């Protein structure tokens, strides 16, 4: 968006250098990307009057001009422009002057004739070629009004000006207009903003006698209105309007078209002007296009329309693509006498889809896509009527025809002074806050500590109280906010927290065990979101996912770890060991925020160690995975218990729940054979722990224990049990009956096969006995040992 300082000052009186103004605007969050200075490199540029013209005696394409530039005598200038003529008021660069590009004007002799200056085109004074009016694109510029010779040409051209180029974010559509920028500037400088004149003198003709409108689908077109201006005279628009449009990046065409574009830039409200005589009826109908409907747009291109496109029709034939471009046969031409002015609100999504599909990006479509200010729709049409009456001699018919609702012009938002001060971190009074909103043009009412702010429709970026707080900070000035040190409830000496320390220890432990850290997306496909979940909870689905594969927040880290292993195995890396410390998510219904829980998970497949001259390779199995989990418990100074269990996606006979203080906090086990087959994996083992629960367990101090002074005794037992009996059950029975002298019970062998029944297995357990107070006797050990054996027998175990 290009903002002319001269144009801006017609609404807001500011006495500020443009670079200071640009810096101040940038500090509020609207970035000024560049400043275009039309006075740069220009010197001695004046207005001249061509008194006479004579053909050059030695050059067919040159003319000798006598030009009054406000000095005692006219100067002679040799000019080659095809459109130069006597009686013209032109731009002259006098001797000693400079033009953009480093051009210096000197006395010269052209084909034997002296020339003391240069009659200039707009391109030569810095106007881009694509913006020069067509009648001047191949020649010099000629003023349409009388200007005193010798006047500063930059002043006469309204180019004694600087233009700021805004790099706007999508939320600040209000700054896509001069008036929106004027409101912002007025707030920054705490000065009033003057709105332009919109009141025209209406004739006795009634608009509803001239035209009628109908909307077929108000979901796509909430509001459509039209006014009629008759008997316009097509001519060039005044120079001030042409130059303002040029500085805004728009090429002037004629007064009627220029007024439409001028109001677009002024209000940010796109208008469309139809030649009333060419519409083909007295009725305008707004509808969605029919399948395979066609129309020719202003650029003479035949357009294939789709059913989602919105079109303006004369009741039968499309005459414009709504919000994008008009049709060729209803455009304003040199023959136009009567004009219908359209002001409307169109669905932003529909306009965006249509403009992208047709590759028709315009100033109008870009504003409709972002949403327009309902408060300005009718006002912009009235402004256009006033300008047509003033600069095109038009007669404005009474009233307007419309259908639909404009909607609310303001949105009320309540905000408390205490909330503002708590958020920005320093004290502002209610009067200070109210003053800022008044500066922004927001009406406010006060009830004790609460301000009700009426946010106008032009500020679509403000919808909640936090947005209002941002406005307060912006206009007050981020640079004025006092510097303070942060206040902490608990001040540390720069050490890691307990959780941070434990996290680092666990990561180091896992990496020491040969696992590499993985970091995966928190999103999975919906079908796998509940896989391996320890608890049955509702999932959290994205409203508009980028892909089906990333549509739901995960409830386990295992699915993505399996993907990572499968990816590696498919690329001949068969020995993979990974862990991940990340968040999982559980829904709490529509009214509550979801739970975010940190989990620790791991996955192992292939060989744990490879062949070496000192050792043989070791294939990963259940006990390797369980050993890593035990190592985690050891590092955290806690003790896990294991219980056989079944979890969706894991092998039913090789899976165990991990318990801490009687509560299930995770699992360890082998992937289900079907899962391994689906991913083309060998035996693969996983573990998953609720890391938050591990961190919540308070760990006491480590107590010193003296090295035992007395020898211990170990006994091995072999038990025949049913194959379904878990070894953990036997170990628990042993501990229950081992008394104080049983130090440890460890399974060291499991046998199934020859000499065993099909439904039986043999489990060998080593029992370690120790008395820290005295030497153990056989009698004492035997008594405890026999009690253990009897307990095992009562549970169906047979001693081998």
Curated annotation (Swiss-Prot):
Subcellular location per UniProt equals: Cytoplasm
Question: Mind telling me which InterPro entries this protein's record contains?
Answer: aa-tRNA-synth_II/BPL/LPL, B3/B4_tRNA-bd, DNA-bd_dom_put_sf, Fdx_antiC-bd, Fdx_antiC-bd_sf, NA-bd_OB-fold, Phe-tRNA-ligase_IIc_bsu, Phe-tRNA-ligase_IIc_bsu_bact
Q: Name one GO cellular component term.
A: phenylalanine-tRNA ligase complex
Q: Where in the numbering of this chain does the FDX-ACB domain appear?
A: 708-800
**Major subcellular location class:** cytoplasm
Q: What does this protein need as cofactor?
A: Mg(2+)
Q: How is the cofactor bound?
A: Binds 2 magnesium ions per tetramer.
Gene3D superfamilies (alphabetical): 3.30.56.10, Bira Bifunctional Protein, Domain 2 (3.30.930.10), Ferrodoxin-fold anticodon-binding domain (3.30.70.380), Nucleic acid-binding proteins (2.40.50.140), Phenylalanyl-trna Synthetase, Chain B, domain 3 (3.50.40.10)
- Where in the chain are disulfide-linked cysteines found? none
Binding-site residues for Mg(2+), renumbered to this chain: 461, 467, 470-471
One Pfam entry for this protein is: FDX-ACB
Q: Name one GO biological process term.
A: phenylalanyl-tRNA aminoacylation
Q: Could you tell me the EC number(s) of this protein?
A: 6.1.1.20
- Signal peptide boundaries: none
Residues of the tRNA-binding domain:
39-154
Q: Name one GO molecular function term.
A: magnesium ion binding
Q: What does it catalyze?
A: tRNA(Phe) + L-phenylalanine + ATP = L-phenylalanyl-tRNA(Phe) + AMP + diphosphate + H(+)
Keyword set for this entry?
Aminoacyl-tRNA synthetase, ATP-binding, Cytoplasm, Ligase, Magnesium, Metal-binding, Nucleotide-binding, Protein biosynthesis, RNA-binding, tRNA-binding
- Ranges of residues in domain B5: 408-483
The UniProt entry, under HAMAP family, shows: Phe_tRNA_synth_beta1
- Family (UniProt): Belongs to the phenylalanyl-tRNA synthetase beta subunit family. Type 1 subfamily.
PANTHER family, alphabetized: PHENYLALANINE--TRNA LIGASE BETA SUBUNIT, PHENYLALANYL-TRNA SYNTHETASE BETA CHAIN AND LEUCINE-RICH REPEAT-CONTAINING PROTEIN 47
Question: What is the annotated quaternary arrangement, including any partners?
Answer: Tetramer of two alpha and two beta subunits.
The name on file for this protein is Phenylalanine--tRNA ligase beta subunit
Protein's organism: Staphylococcus saprophyticus subsp. saprophyticus (strain ATCC 15305 / DSM 20229 / NCIMB 8711 / NCTC 7292 / S-41)
- Top-level taxonomy: Bacteria, Bacillati, Bacillota, Bacilli, Bacillales
This protein's gene is called pheT
